[in-house]
UniProtKB/Swiss-Prot annotation:
Amino-acid positions noted as binding Zn(2+) in the UniProt annotation, renumbered to this chain: C333, H384, H510
Biological role: Catalyzes the attachment of threonine to tRNA(Thr) in a two-step reaction: L-threonine is first activated by ATP to form Thr-AMP and then transferred to the acceptor end of tRNA(Thr). Also edits incorrectly charged L-seryl-tRNA(Thr).
NCBIfam families: thrS
Family the entry assigns: Belongs to the class-II aminoacyl-tRNA synthetase family.
Name of protein: Threonine--tRNA ligase
InterPro entries cross-referenced by the UniProt entry: aa-tRNA-synt_IIb, aa-tRNA-synth_II, aa-tRNA-synth_II/BPL/LPL, Anticodon-bd, Anticodon-bd_dom_sf, Beta-grasp_dom_sf, TGS, TGS-like
Highest taxon listed in the record's lineage: Bacteria
Gene3D superfamilies for this protein: 3.10.20.30, 3.30.54.20, Anticodon-binding domain, Bira Bifunctional Protein, Domain 2, Threonyl-trna Synthetase, Chain A, domain 2
Subcellular location(s) per record: Cytoplasm
Annotated region described as Catalytic, given as residue ranges: 242-533
Source species: Burkholderia thailandensis (strain ATCC 700388 / DSM 13276 / CCUG 48851 / CIP 106301 / E264)
Length: 635
């Protein structure tokens, strides 16, 4: 007798061992048809999995997130099947699920073309319509190696050879195609209805640039066509909002080959940068932070003491001078500890909050660089709080409130918060970890925030809160961090005099709100599609004259506005006014002020807001009042 507990708490009993598919069929024909897999005692399994013991079971359908993963995984195998049918000489390697889809890497003697992708996708559709059953068999490692070598799949054989000899190997087959996989997979290819191949990119075998170069075909798969259509529309919108394209269009920045991963900021882009930095500086000052500046290049001995030299050296830029080794700092924390150590600290000095817009450099792989989002040289809104264990909760509460307020001001109102908890290998006592984790939990609770807990995901030296902001397209970006550190103060010898005159180590809270300034500006540009709120925009307004006779008045308007602290320029070119309006509209300037003879005589301006909204004619001071209302909240 096998007893199976279902998600609603009910128990079904069977005389003999049953498969997941048979359990689904016993519940109802609709569920049997919809079943993609099962969750057996928390583990994802195929519908063909045999249950021969008492267990809990949830039937997985396309309404579940796990169901979508199964569909995407199976579609990756369908892709490999289609490629092998059309290009028998291609060698298959790996094909995992990724966010919003999947990819599969192939070794082939020539590049896949867009026409190839069309043909492959068409063949995938044909194979799916055949509704071929997907079967699983378990074999020994040696048997699997022998099989893949016999059909010329050397990459698959190499993967299997790296698996312990005692492990069982799962092979999945549909039609004439067999692949190595942990599974689970859909019961038949007919379940794969909505998919699209997206692009081809380069990759390396096992991710190592020293190995053979492969071709990676990316695809997306969904349960419903409308979901895929929405995703494809989002990608189209994302392409329009690409910060690299807008950076060029709006003349904000550029990156060139002579300085890979380093940004050349143009005047408008640097104005945007300054608006963000000055805003952050005001917020930090009001929150009790002390701004400092630490050296960019420091001796190897400091990086050895901090542990970076041993654990992070391959990501650091190093240099040598007068027989001494130096590193360009990849992060600011060791320097902040040096400032804390410079002088005797008392418990009365704590909490001590040091902030720095610190310039850091990391030797990122050239293939990973991506506009402002992944660079080698960047500035962080970095700060470190030195406090006692008893102050963790209050400092975390203050930081949560500050971070959420900042995100709101920048236009982000959807924030996902994740709390990473103690890993198995860690420093410090369980009591210390209990205190630290509970302090962060209570801080989130006190701020009325919801969060997801990630057991085992914390660093070995302390728990961490991550702040993931969602942009206008629903994409998630991890920006803010609050990392509790019980290690670095000890490694670098930071201490304070406690109330009983003993020497104690402070707790160190690493924290950032925007993170990398470059990356945050890239996110901002894409979130607002380049149309920055007036308080952030490089220019608040541009004054346009209709004819040369109004040029002097236009200049007078500009000077008047500039004297009041507004960022305004004039376009006095001898061009048609429609041409000038179109040009500055494309530059996404918040306000265009048009002046003709009537406006000059009446000492007024005709105001056009972004988006072509005609606000009518008004005195200059009335416009100033309107603009100040627009930006006042962030001054």
């Amino acid at each position: 007798m096998v007893s199976i507990r279902l998600p609603d708490g009910s128990i079904r009993q069977y005389e003999h061992p049953v498969t997941v598919a048979e359990v689904a069929a016993s519940i109802g024909p609709g569920l049997a048809k919809a079943a993609l897999g099962g969750k057996l005692d928390g583990e994802l399994v195929d519908t063909s999995a045999l249950i021969d013991r008492d267990a809990s079971l949830a039937i997985v359908t396309d309404k579940d997130a796990d169901g979508l993963d199964i569909i995407r995984h199976s579609t990756a195998h369908l892709l490999a099947y289609a490629v092998k049918e059309l290009h028998p000489d291609a060698q298959v390697t790996i094909g995992p699920v990724i966010d919003n889809g999947f990819y599969y890497d192939f070794s082939y003697h020539r590049p896949f073309t867009p026409e190839d992708l069309e043909a492959i996708e068409k063949r995938m559709q044909e194979l799916a319509k055949r509704d071929e059953p997907v079967t699983r068999r378990v074999v020994s490692r040696d048997e699997a190696v022998s099989y893949f070598r016999s059909i010329g799949e050397k990459y698959k054989a190499e993967i299997i050879e790296s698996i312990p000899a005692s492990d069982e190997i799962k092979l999945y087959s549909h039609g004439g195609f067999t692949d190595l996989c942990r599974g689970p997979h859909v019961p038949s290819t007919g379940k794969l209805k909505v998919f699209k191949l997206m692009k081809v990119a380069g990759a390396y075998w096992r991710g190592d640039s020293k190995n053979e170069q492969l071709q990676r075909i990316y695809g997306t798969a969904w349960t419903k066509k409308e979901d895929q259509d929405a995703y494809l529309h989002m990608l189209e919108e994302a392409e329009k909002r690409d910060h690299r394209k807008l950076g060029k269009q709006l003349d904000l920045f550029h990156i060139q080959e002579e300085a890979p991963g380093m940004v050349f900021w143009h005047p408008k882009g640097w104005t945007l940068w300054q608006r963000v930095e000055q805003y952050m500086r005001r917020r930090l000052d009001a929150a009790g932070y002390l701004e400092i500046k630490t050296p960019m290049i420091m001796d190897r001995s400091l990086w050895e003491a901090s542990g970076h030299w041993q654990n992070y050296r391959e990501n650091m830029f190093t240099t040598e001078s007068e027989k001494r080794d130096y590193a360009i700092k990849p992060m600011n924390c060791p320097g902040h500890v040096q400032v804390f150590k410079h002088g005797l600290r008392s418990y009365r000095d704590l909490p001590l909050r040091y902030a720095e817009f610190g310039s850091c450099h990391r030797n990122e792989a050239s293939g990973a660089l991506h506009g402002l989002m992944r660079v080698r040289g960047f500035v962080q809104d970095d700060a470190h709080i030195f406090c006692t264990e008893d102050q963790i909760n209050s400092e975390a509460i203050a930081f949560n409130k500050l971070a959420m307020s900042v995100y709101e001001d920048f236009g982000f109102d959807r924030i996902d918060i994740k709390l990473s908890l103690r890993p198995e290998q860690r420093m410090g006592s369980d009591e210390t970890w209990d205190h630290a984790e509970e302090g962060l939990r209570n801080a989130l609770k006190a701020c009325g925030l919801e969060w997801e807990e990630l057991p085992g995901e914390g660093a070995f030296y302390g728990p961490k809160i991550e702040y993931h902001i969602k942009d206008a397209l629903g994409r998630s970006w991890q920006c803010g961090t609050l990392q509790l550190d019980m290690m670095l103060p000890e490694r670098l010898g930071a201490e304070y005099v406690a109330e009983d005159n003993s020497r104690r180590r402070p707790v160190m809270l690493h924290r950032a709100i925007v993170g990398s300034m470059e990356r945050f500006l890239g996110i901002l540009i894409e979130h607002h599609a380049g149309a920055m709120p007036a308080w952030l925009a490089p220019f608040h307004a541009v004054v346009l004259n209709i004819a040369e006779s109004q040029a002097e008045y236009a200049q007078t308007v500009v000077q008047s506005l500039q004297k009041q602290g507004l960022r305004v320029s004039a376009d006095l070119r001898n061009e048609k006014i429609s041409y000038k309006i179109r040009e500055h509209t494309l530059e996404k300037v918040p306000y265009l002020l048009v002046v003709g003879d009537k406006e000059r005589e009446a000492q007024t301006v005709a105001v056009r807001a972004r988006g072509g909204v005609d606000l009518g004619v008004m005195p200059v001071e009335a416009f100033v009042e309107r603009l100040r209302e627009d930006i006042q909240a962030f001054k």
